[in-house]
Amino acid sequence: MQALVLLLWTGALLGFGRCQNAGQEAGSLTPESTGAPVEEEDPFFKVPVNKLAAAVSNFGYDLYRVRSGESPTANVLLSPLSVATALSALSLGAEQRTESNIHRALYYDLISNPDIHGTYKDLLASVTAPQKNLKSASRIIFERKLRIKASFIPPLEKSYGTRPRILTGNSRVDLQEINNWVQAQMKGKVARSTREMPSEISIFLLGVAYFKGQWVTKFDSRKTSLEDFYLDEERTVKVPMMSDPQAVLRYGLDSDLNCKIAQLPLTGSTSIIFFLPQKVTQNLTLIEESLTSEFIHDIDRELKTVQAVLTIPKLKLSYEGELTKSVQELKLQSLFDAPDFSKITGKPIKLTQVEHRVGFEWNEDGAGTNSSPGVQPARLTFPLDYHLNQPFIFVLRDTDTGALLFIGKILDPRGT
């Protein structure tokens, strides 16, 4: 009964993003073809940087779905923005066919913007502003002795704030240099890699990111205790759980996805949206398939402010690994076969490696003890609990631009 009341109350959010996403699939009917009225574009997406953020974020949700499918029984932690940034920067050196392939994967073909790279510079400036607490960086690394055309470097520096790196051919020296770069960009928050350098590199893309959230309302550390986290219907583990018996959050229930959705604000105009299935399960595919920039934007508009009993596991996770196969799955196999990067060099080169290193954490830390006085929770006739004590998905979103900053599938808060 409680769920039904919330469902009716927040029914406007159900299915908006999925319907919009489905309408973009090949062969689907459009308003023009059916004679139906054309839905006016949301004013939020008329802002160039927001529209670009939506496109890049949709790439991010695609990448997450592929990665999650590859690891159905493991945590997934990604900052897709850093990978998208590396690909977008690489497209500066691509001729038309190869450039179009990259732009389609990044959904640039759906936006009319003659200055994609200039707008990307604005997006990066917004999401990496100091108050956001996000560190994100990308780098293009080329094979040893490659002669790069001088015309490639200035636009790369102008829009993406980075210079390419050419390998020395000494794997120990190259790994040390890459580690030093990562340490400098992430201020030591992402661990140094001990993995060996790949033996055959032509183009190596590296995306790194780190985020430590600061809640708008901090948790009382005295209320943190070891509690059960349900890995599945049969297994539990003890993890540190933060709690707030009078938390103010934004909430809704999606009957199509059979999950409870909550949003908590962070400092710096960011927020985390949680997707919690109604039943304990590690199969989160139904939720994952719904995720698009448009759907998340609709959720952000429609959730209602309520007061609830809230418990959240403390989280400190990291990931280091290859995303090469995942990127290939996003209709980018041609970059690994015979692409045309003749704006970079006269020599045939191709993408051979995509690597991702990220760190993410939240704990009790926050800005204050009281929620914003301007936001009054709705009165409910029933108590509301929101316990993240089972597998869930979280989305870290930039409020200003709508950009996807981090996404995670948490099957075990202890990490792997």
Swiss-Prot record:
The N-terminal (AA 42-139) exhibits neurite outgrowth-inducing activity. The C-terminal exposed loop (AA 380-416) is essential for serpin activity. Residues 1-20 form the signal peptide. Retinal pigment epithelial cells. Located in the interphotoreceptor matrix (IPM) which is between the retinal pigment epithelium and the neural retina. The keyword Transmembrane helix does not apply. GO terms for cellular component: extracellular region; extracellular space; melanosome. Keywords: Glycoprotein, Phosphoprotein, Secreted, Signal. Neurotrophic protein; induces extensive neuronal differentiation in retinoblastoma cells. Potent inhibitor of angiogenesis. As it does not undergo the S (stressed) to R (relaxed) conformational transition characteristic of active serpins, it exhibits no serine protease inhibitory activity. It comes from Bos taurus. Glycans are attached at N283. The modification Phosphoserine is found at S112, S225. Interacts with PNPLA2; this interaction stimulates the phospholipase A2 activity of PNPLA2. One of its GO terms (biological process) is positive regulation of neurogenesis. PROSITE patterns: SERPIN. GO terms for molecular function: serine-type endopeptidase inhibitor activity. InterPro entries: PEDF_serpin_dom, Serpin_CS, Serpin_dom, Serpin_fam, Serpin_sf, Serpin_sf_1, Serpin_sf_2. Belongs to the serpin family. Its main location: secreted. It is found in: Secreted; Melanosome. The keyword Signal applies. This is Pigment epithelium-derived factor. It comes from the Eukaryota.
